[in-house]
Regions:
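Short beta-rich binding modules
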Residues: 2-184
Length: 184
């Protein structure tokens, strides 16, 4: 764990960000405020997103704190995010973590979006305990190939308005200096 902060995007969306670092390489995990995209989601869907986000965040916090040490008094995302960031910035950053990092559908590295399975834990586990992090079928460890999006070419107009004049280039001959007759 390197740092954590609360911020707002240029478009006004609220989020908190957690940065992990190992040997100079960083992973930035952004947790966005769950919102109702143009009224497309039900109240239950929003609540499910909030619960999932809370569970994922608790997995991270429990690497540094005992459950009874974590008290949240916030009533909205902004207050929750501030409390999470405060806890993370006060955490012992020398404590090593074992983190499962996967690719999302756009080819970026991220933490898994699920909360049901373990994806982060302390590197040093209590005596007799083994790692709960496992490779799941839903995990993507191979960077997906994302094809370029082709944009259609706009037709300049009716075909009769385009005049095409064939050009004739000087013929290239096969000779000792150019045995294949190539123009280069």
């Amino acid at each position: 764990l390197k740092s954590a902060r609360v911020a707002e995007s240029p478009t006004g969306r609220k989020f908190f960000e957690v940065v992990f670092e190992k040997n100079g390489a960083t992973l930035t995990q952004t947790e966005w405020k769950p919102d109702n995209k143009n009224g497309q989601l039900s109240d239950e869907d929003i609540q499910r997103k909030e619960d999932n986000q809370f569970s994922r965040t608790m997995q991270l916090l429990l690497c540094f704190y005992k459950d009874e040490e974590l008290v949240f008094n916030g009533t909205n995302f902004e207050e929750f995010a501030k409390e999470v960031v405060d806890y993370l910035n006060k955490a012992d950053k020398s404590k090593l973590l074992r983190v499962k990092i996967v690719y999302n559908d756009k080819g970026y590295t991220t933490l898994p979006s699920y909360a049901k399975y373990t994806f982060i834990e302390p590197m040093i586990l209590p005596e007799g305990q083994t790692s709960a992090i496992t490779e799941l079928r839903i995990d993507n460890f191979t960077k997906p190939v994302v094809a370029d999006v082709e944009t259609p070419v706009v037709n300049p107009g009716p075909s009769e308005s385009i005049s095409i004049s064939p050009t004739v280039e000087a013929a290239v001959e096969n000779n000792a200096e150019n045995p294949y007759g190539l123009p280069f």
